[in-house]
């Protein structure tokens, strides 16, 4: 891994622990979805991993923007994708503010299936003739169960 030693994880923040539809689910009248307990209002699945040298988000679902605002995230070093379902990819376009803030391209770590889905759903971000207002990203291929480094963290 580039001859550098990846650092230890300092903090892990669960950004969302809900279902693929979030909780409450539209039209559901079960006790969880109708509960007034704020713990039962859950955004779609995502986690933020922080080390001393960097911050990585795992999956950018439809709630990614709200999650970043809620946690006051000002810097993001990489995104790692677990799989190609829309509830894990839909927020990719919202990496743009990090492009502007950090003046850098966002590395996206993804399998070949996730890469294909991203290029299909966000084709404008991968076109040769880039124009303003599109996310600036660089896909870095990862394989299941292989170690890689993202944002200074060693991940598998």
Pin down the residues of each PLM region.
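Binuclear metal-dependent hydrolase catalytic cores
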Residues: 2-156
């Amino acid at each position: 891994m580039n001859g550098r030693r990846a650092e230890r994880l300092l903090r892990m923040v669960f950004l969302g622990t809900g279902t693929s539809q979030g909780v409450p689910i539209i039209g559901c009248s079960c006790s969880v979805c109708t509960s007034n307990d704020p713990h039962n209002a859950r955004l779609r699945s995502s986690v933020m991993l922080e080390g001393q040298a960097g911050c990585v988000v795992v999956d950018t679902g439809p709630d990614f923007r709200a999650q970043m605002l809620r946690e006051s995230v000002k810097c993001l070093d990489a995104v790692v994708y677990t799989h190609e379902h829309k509830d894990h990819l839909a927020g990719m376009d919202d990496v743009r503010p990090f492009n502007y803030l950090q003046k850098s391209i966002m590395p996206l770590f993804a399998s070949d299936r996730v890469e294909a889905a991203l290029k299909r759903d966000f084709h404008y971000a991968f076109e040769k003739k880039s124009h303003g207002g599109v996310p600036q990203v660089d896909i870095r291929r990862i394989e299941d169960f292989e170690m890689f480094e993202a944002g200074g963290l060693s991940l598998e």
